Amino acid sequence: MELDLRRIKAERIAKGYTQDIVAEKMGWKSRGPYAKRENGVVPFGADELADFGNILGYSVNELGIFFTKNVPEKER
């Protein structure tokens, strides 16, 4: 199972949030740490993914939407 980073970005944009807004809500002083995760440079930690989901209004039980078994490498 792989984390679908395109879905993460799409859901953030659909909710009207910029990377700066999400980073601030996650307690980071700049968007850099969040941007690195969304772009796949640094992996999301489990707690970070739960926090991200919560920011967008998803419960822990709904986080499965951010995972898929068949995300091609070039689309991650």
PLM regions with names:
Residues 32-33, 43, 62:
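Residues in the helix-turn-helix
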Residues 16, 41-54:
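Short, basic-rich loop-to-helix N-cap that marks the start of a DNA-contacting helix
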Residues 11, 36, 54, 61-76:
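Short, charged recognition helix plus adjacent turn
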Residues 9, 20, 50:
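Residues within the helices of the helix-turn-helix
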Residues 26, 37-38, 48, 56, ...:
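DNA major-groove recognition helix of helix-turn-helix
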Residues 1-14:
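A short, Lys/Arg-rich alpha-helix, primarily the initiator
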Residues 5-6, 31, 46-49:
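Short alpha-helical elements of helix-turn-helix
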Residues 16-36:
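Short alpha-helical DNA-recognition segment
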